[in-house]
């Protein structure tokens, strides 16, 4: 979600991968007017909410340290614990849940029913500032 703030885009959840987050930001800038990212709000610890953070937060922005990255209390602990402690099981389940092990065929590909599947790109994680 993009919110047009007074000083730039406030991004609520950064999608699941870098490539889709960057494409979404580019689409908004091209069609709604160019704005810098002024804040990022991540609502919870699932990767589809923070995985694209490096697609909207460049090294230069992060080095400056003036972009608030707002998360719930305990976010880093829970995100790391979820990835480390349950990551293998979640990844294995996702292969079946989202049809990742079924190759696309002549009629398309298997999807998750409520969505057309997960983006297949690079994920990222940035430390919160707030």
Please identify what each model-predicted range represents:
Residues 16-18, 45-48, 75-77:
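Solvent-exposed loop/turn segments at secondary-structure junctions
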Residues 1-35:
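Conserved beta-strand hairpin/beta-sheet module of binuclear metal-dependent hydrolase folds
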Residues 38-41, 68-75:
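Short internal beta-strands
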Residues 50-64:
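Metal-dependent catalytic neighborhoods of phosphoester/phosphodiester hydrolases
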Residues 35-37, 60-67:
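A short helix->loop->beta-strand "cap" motif at the edges of active sites that frequently abuts
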Residues 37-50, 77-130:
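Metallo-beta-lactamase
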Residues 22-23, 52-53, 79-84:
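Short, solvent-exposed loop/turn and secondary-structure capping segments
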């Amino acid at each position: 979600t993009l919110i047009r703030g007074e000083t730039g885009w406030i991004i609520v959840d950064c999608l699941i991968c870098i490539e889709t987050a960057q494409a979404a930001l580019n689409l908004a800038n091209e069609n709604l007017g160019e704005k810098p990212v002024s804040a990022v709000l991540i609502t919870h610890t699932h990767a589809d909410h923070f995985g694209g953070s490096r697609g909207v937060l460049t090294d230069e922005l992060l080095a400056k340290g003036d972009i608030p990255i707002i998360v719930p209390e305990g976010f880093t602990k829970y995100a790391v614990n979820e990835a480390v402690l349950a990551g293998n099981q979640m990844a294995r389940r996702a292969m079946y849940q989202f049809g990742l092990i079924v190759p696309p065929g002549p009629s398309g590909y298997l999807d998750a029913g409520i969505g057309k599947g997960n983006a297949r790109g690079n994920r990222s994680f940035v430390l919160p500032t707030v």
